[in-house]
Amino acid sequence: MDTRSGSQCSVTPEAILNNEKLVLPPRISRVNGWSLPLHYFQVVTWAVFVGLSSATFGIFIPFLPHAWKYIAYVVTGGIFSFHLVVHLIASCIDPADSNVRLMKNYSQPMPLFDRSKHAHVIQNQFCHLCKVTVNKKTKHCISCNKCVSGFDHHCKWINNCVGSRNYWFFFSTVASATAGMLCLIAILLYVLVQYLVNPGVLRTDPRYEDVKNMNTWLLFLPLFPVQVQTLIVVIIGMLVLLLDFLGLVHLGQLLIFHIYLKAKKMTTFEYLINNRKEESSKHQAVRKDPYVQMDKGVLQQGAGALGSSAQGVKAKSSLLIHKHLCHFCTSVNQDGDSTAREGDEDPCPSALGAKARNSRLICRRLCQFSTRVHPDGGSMAQEADDAPSISTLGLQQETTEPMKTDSAESED
């Protein structure tokens, strides 16, 4: 069932993807749960019902003492019979809208929905496929390809849509199945405990007088007695108990869920739509959250700062060497100039003047070399000073984290 949000449309009978397979709606609208094709969930349901009924009334209830045996037949038989009736009614009822049932010919094929002509299947309470006016809570089911009044959901276990016409029969089916599972578990546990404590209590039927072996048991009493060994009874009991427990868990959850829906005055369809809207709003809120964007910006800034910090360290080192060289050369030049002036007064000026000129020449070449190695040392050093350090990034992140926590608490 393809559900779509909207006030007038729930399901569009178009080709949809289900488990990566293209699923087309049936061309002929389905009348009820017995319309072909039958769903394999429906077949499994009836097979389990027949199997559990046979095991309950044919194997385990005959093990009970006479006083408990007749009570179990009445109580368990009443629950199973009630379940059978409501299950059949829920499957046989046509849950379609009243106008659909009056005006629709189920033998005629349904047209395919053309979205280029209409945005939704149902618009202004008119179905463009069924060609009838429907109620406000009517939805068009893709599995049945018809409008269902008071649409709740399409149940694969009864192979029919659940709407306002058959909802309470469906609810009674789930409730009676849960009650029957509980009765069967109680009977199985009693038989198991008595077999471990006092097996003779389970052999009260008069036909056991002819059975001498204590490991031989009679099944399907009193109509068709069949002698089997203890191992066979234990295997059947464990399988039935496991199947009963799994069914009870599934049916119990389903029953509690529908009790919750009735308390909230909602349908299954409305519950699913509301959940989808809440999830969509949460995703949009996360995308628009400024604190999430701030955290991403801080991380990006931190990654850039690490690179710029490394460049800044190199720039500062080269600039420091450049400054020391120039300072050294300046001091040497000054010493050289003074030495040269003293050399003019010295009786041997030629030797001292030559040394001064050589010193100045060496210093000039060193300064030129350092300038070529790092011509933009000043600008890179300034960039390194302006780049945020690791401690600064940590302070920014610690500052933003409490703000994000407060925002999350306010949203909750």
Curated annotation (Swiss-Prot):
The way it spans or sits in the membrane comes to: Multi-pass membrane protein
The residue spans the entry assigns to the Cytoplasmic side of the membrane are as follows 1-42, 91-176, 252-412
Enzyme Commission code = 2.3.1.225
Q: Which GO terms describe its molecular function?
A: protein-cysteine S-palmitoyltransferase activity; signaling adaptor activity
Where is this chain compositionally biased, Polar residues type? 389-400
Q: Catalysed reaction per UniProt?
A: L-cysteinyl-[protein] + hexadecanoyl-CoA = S-hexadecanoyl-L-cysteinyl-[protein] + CoA
InterPro entries reported for this sequence:
Palmitoyltrfase_DHHC (IPR001594), PFA4/ZDH16/20/ERF2-like (IPR039859)
Q: Where is the active site?
A: C155
GO BP:
antiviral innate immune response; peptidyl-L-cysteine S-palmitoylation; positive regulation of defense response to virus by host; protein targeting to membrane
Q: Where located?
A: Endoplasmic reticulum membrane
Principal subcellular localization: endoplasmic reticulum
What keywords does the record list, in alphabetical order? Acyltransferase, Endoplasmic reticulum, Lipoprotein, Membrane, Palmitate, Transferase, Transmembrane, Transmembrane helix
DHHC domain residues are 125-175
Spell out the residue ranges making up region: Mediates interaction with IRF3 and STING1. Answer: 198-412
Write out the transmembrane intervals: 43-63, 70-90, 177-197, 231-251
Q: What tissues harbor this protein?
A: Expressed in testis.
| A Pfam family of this chain | DHHC
Which stretches does the entry tag as region Disordered?
Answer: 374-412
Please give the residue ranges for the topological domain Lumenal.
64-69, 198-230
CC terms in the record's Gene Ontology section: endoplasmic reticulum; endoplasmic reticulum membrane; endosome membrane; Golgi apparatus; Golgi membrane
Question: Biased-composition ranges for Basic and acidic residues?
Answer: 401-412
What does the subunit comment say? Answer: Interacts with IRF3 and STING1; in presence of DNA viruses recruits IRF3 to STING1 promoting IRF3 phosphorylation and activation.
Q: What is known of its domains?
A: The DHHC domain is required for palmitoyltransferase activity.
Q: What does this protein do?
A: Endoplasmic reticulum-localized palmitoyltransferase that could catalyze the addition of palmitate onto various protein substrates and be involved in a variety of cellular processes. Has a palmitoyltransferase activity toward NCDN and regulates NCDN association with endosome membranes through this palmitoylation. May play a role in cell proliferation. Also has a palmitoyltransferase activity-independent function in DNA virus-triggered and CGAS-mediated innate immune response. Functions as an adapter that recruits IRF3 to STING1 to promote the activation of that key transcriptional regulator of type I interferon (IFN)-dependent immune response.
Instruction: Say which family it is in.
Output: Belongs to the DHHC palmitoyltransferase family.
**What is this protein's name?**
Palmitoyltransferase ZDHHC11
